[in-house]
Amino acid sequence: MASSTSLAIVLHQSSNHDELFMKQTLQFSETLKDLKNLRKQLYSAAEYFETSYGKAEHKETVIETLKEYAAKAVVNTVDHLGSVSDKFNSFLSDNSTHFSTTHLRLSSLEQRMRLCRDYMGKSGTHQHLLLFQYPRHHKRYFFPQQGRGTSFSAGDDSHRFTSAVRSTILENLPNTARKANKTGSFSFAPIVHNNINNRTPNKRSNSPMRFPLLRSGSLLKRSSSPSQPKKPPLALPEPQRAISVSRNTEIVEIKQSSSRKGKKILMFKALMSMSKSRN
């Protein structure tokens, strides 16, 4: 409702303005026509007085009437010129105000368009800046945990990553597997061949995991021929077995305690280097 009423007011004002403009133009054209007719009237009056002055006997009365008519004609011409100039000035003043308002509207529209263009340009540059991905770290990052002088680059990613994964796999093994490894490290299976000497090298069995498990040299060794019959392992004497078990358990505990300290650090380094190389 408010929009319809405002539109009706604007239309009414525009119609009134058009009506006033038409009235002013008609009045101005009428005054110009009166001036043109005044010229014709003056010429016809001059011809009439010329003919009457030559024919009439009372020339003094003709001269006086001519003077009166000329004075009235001059007054009428001045009046017409004044009215025309007044109307022309009013027309110019009204149009000048209208022109000034239109100029202000145009300037405001230009300013709005300029602001919109600036905003669009800034938003576009902001979006382009968001698209860029700037590096957050250097190519070589120094870790103060293992010493200030050491650094970790992207060249040795694979080696350290594999070692870290192996250490995590060993750490996450169940206790039963660890106990089996510990107990199995002290039993040996003899290598028996029918036609081949004992000098042939043994081959380690392949691990089912992706990364092979770290094994000590004292684990069980299997023969390369799967068809050979298995024999019971040779039993060591009791004192020798107790000494070897105690020594091996101490060595394994020392290795595990030393390896656990650097497992998490190596894993963290490997992951950081891989993320840097991808960036």
From Swiss-Prot:
Main location, first listed in the record: cytoplasm
Q: Which UniProt keywords apply?
A: Cytoplasm, Cytoskeleton
Biased composition, Low complexity: where in the chain? Answer: 219-228
Query: Keyword Ribosomal protein: yes or no?
Result: no
The UniProt entry, under InterPro entries, shows:
ABI (IPR028457)
* Disulfide-bonded cysteines: none
Check the record and name the PANTHER family matching this protein.
ABL INTERACTOR FAMILY MEMBER, PROTEIN ABIL4
Q: What the protein does?
A: Involved in regulation of actin and microtubule organization. Part of a WAVE complex that activates the Arp2/3 complex.
Subunit: Binds SCAR.
Instruction: State the family named in the UniProt similarity comment for this chain.
Output: Belongs to the ABI family.
Q: What is this protein called?
A: Protein ABIL4
Q: Which lineage ranks, top first, belong to the organism behind this chain?
A: Eukaryota, Viridiplantae, Streptophyta, Embryophyta, Tracheophyta
